[in-house]
Amino acid sequence: MCRFVDAIKSLLDESDITTLVALANRLSPFRVDYRRVVVGDALSVKPILVLEHEQPPCDGAWRSAAHINLGLGAAQQQHHPVPTRAVHGAAVGGVQCDGLASPPVSNNVMSDGTVDGDDDDLGYDQDTLYNQGTDYENEGGAVGQDGLPAPDAGLFQECMFSHRSASTPRAGGHGESYCQEVAQSSHAITCRELLERCILPNFEINHLENCESSTSGGIHHCLPDEHSGMTGLARNTPSASPVENSITVELDGALEIATDVRTGKFNTLRAAKRHRRNTSSLRLSSHDAGCVGDARSSAGVVKSPARRSTAVSDAALRKVKYAARTCIRADYFQFLEANLPRWVRDGIWGKEWSPNQTANVDGYENLQKAYWHVCRLDRQMRDDAIRSRMAMVLLHLEYENTCLSWKTCAHSGKKPVTKVGRGNISSLIDNIIENTHPEWRTADPGERSELRAKFHDRKRYGKRWWMLVKPLGSSILMLCSSKFAGMIKNTTVTAAMINEIKLAIQRSETGLMSLLSLANPIAESLFLDQGYDGHNAEQVLKALRAARLEVAPGEGVA
């Protein structure tokens, strides 16, 4: 039994949201229900497992994700603080009792904005956004198990934006600040406890530290300290270090959330797309917009085709600025002064391509050559980062060119022999790997899969560098710092972030583009391995000396 409990804990700690949703969906005949319990003088929301046929859900109770489809998009003009007001003598189920009551809140999602008139073009029926079966007619709220008020659908949202409404009069006319009462209680439920005890469908909230309710802080004191691909929180607190991990605000398999820079309000997918056409990037700029739950959050989201947000968070933008500031190695001039004369004389690639490597590569010799260079550099010149970057970019370009040639039937060479489950391109890659790695012929299926994975990994890295080479020029491959190269190789730096890095370098006022432009002609010749002997190294160095760039100190060599 202990091992079963440990296994479940490990699953909950390590699995992604997809795995957890699958687990929740397979709990039948059990389901997750929520029960309010009173601990001392404070309210606690406790998730419990119940058998479907033994304890059917009460009318008005907040049902689990398997029974309710909550969504984003509805807007109401009022907020309700955390429902913790003690009510003595409240009528619950016709019985007079003491306990805690909550405001009459429906399952509709609350927002501090107005109804987005463009929500009707999202591609799904707006009527499915809400649960229509819950009725909160009584002041005491719906009645749950054990004679206690059932939890509201807005309970989690109310805690999330309680720091806004701490001093806001209640919609029903009450002016008390109930969230302050909770914070002052020694037994009050904290945001951390609420997040631990509530299931938030389709969201994953990772690494919440130091998350305590307070009269002055609220939920924006929850500071995640590690990157997460799906997180419901974004940190806006300025950082003392520019190299923090990226925190993105995006929903996996659900509706995207973006922020209007002018109003600080969250928009739906279409509004976000329109806004992205008018601004270079979307960022969470206001302190109040620091949490998804502040404006248009709920305990669930409308299920729609999976989309990824192209917006970049505040923390990611700080990382982008740091990358742009440190993209050039600090010793770039000394480095070029020592190597440029030799490169102009001999080129950068060194060993000539061996003709005997072209066996069985009719029609895709260039792709074979590019991959041969990548592998040779890995084996013999592990310290030669510049040539490795150039080789990976060439591998990506030749692969794209070869695929285009095959797909458009422009290829006139002999097609490789295909096998079951292996098409033309896959068989072509197998031939290239076989020509490069002699051990391919005796490798088992697992070893062959590993060699294929290495091929595609190098090609993907080349594609990421090509995203920078195309707008900035080949000199970025030659002059970049080791920190910058590490960021580009790190897959947590998304394609959207690489695009922002490119824009930041282009808009830099420190002379970055001037420096790269001066080095681009000779870098391109070295990259293409042609015409490099026609450049005058002394003139290039003289121009670079006149355009000396102030770079961040302490940047390591590439």
From Swiss-Prot:
Keywords on record: Nucleus, Transcription, Transcription regulation
Disulfide bonds: none
Domain of life according to the entry: Eukaryota
Disruption phenotype: Blocks the expression of the aurovertin gene cluster and impairs the production of aurovertins.
Compartment annotation: Nucleus
GO cellular component, one term: nucleus
Family the entry assigns: Belongs to the POU transcription factor family. Class-3 subfamily.
Function: Transcription factor that regulates the expression of the gene cluster that mediates the biosynthesis of aurovertins, fungal polyketides that exhibit potent inhibition of adenosine triphosphate synthase.
Protein name according to UniProt: Aurovertin biosynthesis cluster transcription factor aurF
Organism the protein comes from: Calcarisporium arbuscula
